[in-house]
């Protein structure tokens, strides 16, 4: 019995050794890099599209449950940033994927029923100032959240640049639950 299994393994190895050899054509490094770049750009666009959908739902939930929350804050319902303010893994292709500026805060997404939408702010707009205070190019999203929270329920005059034209938009803030909602890219379940 043992000699049969040895013979079977040996004949299998012999057949593998006598099989045809295939060679893949050489790949051009520029084509490989272009494919990698396209994958990264698509990944960034997909991630921020999912994040925008999540923010739409989260803002509605926060506003609807406003009276039931212990911790509340004022919110305007937009996500903005500059290339340096984005997470490091998104910086290299974010300008191409999202048209985000290096120096001016660019609106990445606006929640559908948000105060920012009511004020006419759209993705791609550049946010120059909030109540004549310049929007910084680093930690942009955190700065906006902090500014809106400190401003309270007072309207915010935002200088918006769209297609090279500056306009003042007035955003009337809304009180909402101050619960954190984040999009995490992890395959393990974290909610039950």
Name each model feature, range by range.
Residues 37-50, 110-115, 134:
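Second-shell loop/turn segments in exported
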Residues 116-139:
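Conserved PDZ fold ligand-binding element
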Residues 17-39:
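Bacterial Sec signal peptide processing site at the extreme N-terminus
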Residues 8-16:
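Bacterial N-terminal signal peptides
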């Amino acid at each position: 019995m043992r000699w049969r299994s040895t013979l079977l393994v040996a004949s299998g190895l012999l057949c593998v050794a006598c099989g045809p050899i295939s060679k893949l054509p050489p790949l051009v490094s520029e084509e490989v890099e272009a494919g990698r770049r396209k994958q990264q750009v698509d990944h960034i666009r997909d991630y921020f599209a999912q994040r925008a959908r999540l923010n739409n739902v989260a803002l509605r939930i926060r506003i609807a449950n406003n009276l039931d929350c212990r911790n509340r804050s004022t919110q305007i319902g937009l996500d903005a940033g500059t290339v340096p303010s984005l997470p490091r893994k998104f910086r290299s292709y974010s300008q191409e994927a999202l048209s985000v500026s290096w120096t001016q805060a660019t609106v990445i997404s606006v929640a559908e029923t948000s105060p920012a939408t009511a004020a006419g702010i759209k993705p791609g707009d550049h946010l120059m100032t909030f109540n004549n205070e310049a929007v910084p190019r680093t930690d942009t999203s955190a700065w906006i959240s902090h500014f809106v929270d400190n401003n309270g329920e007072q309207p915010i005059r935002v200088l918006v640049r769209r297609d090279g034209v500056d306009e003042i938009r007035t955003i009337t803030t809304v009180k909402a639950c101050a619960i954190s909602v984040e999009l995490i890219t992890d395959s393990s379940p974290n909610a039950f």
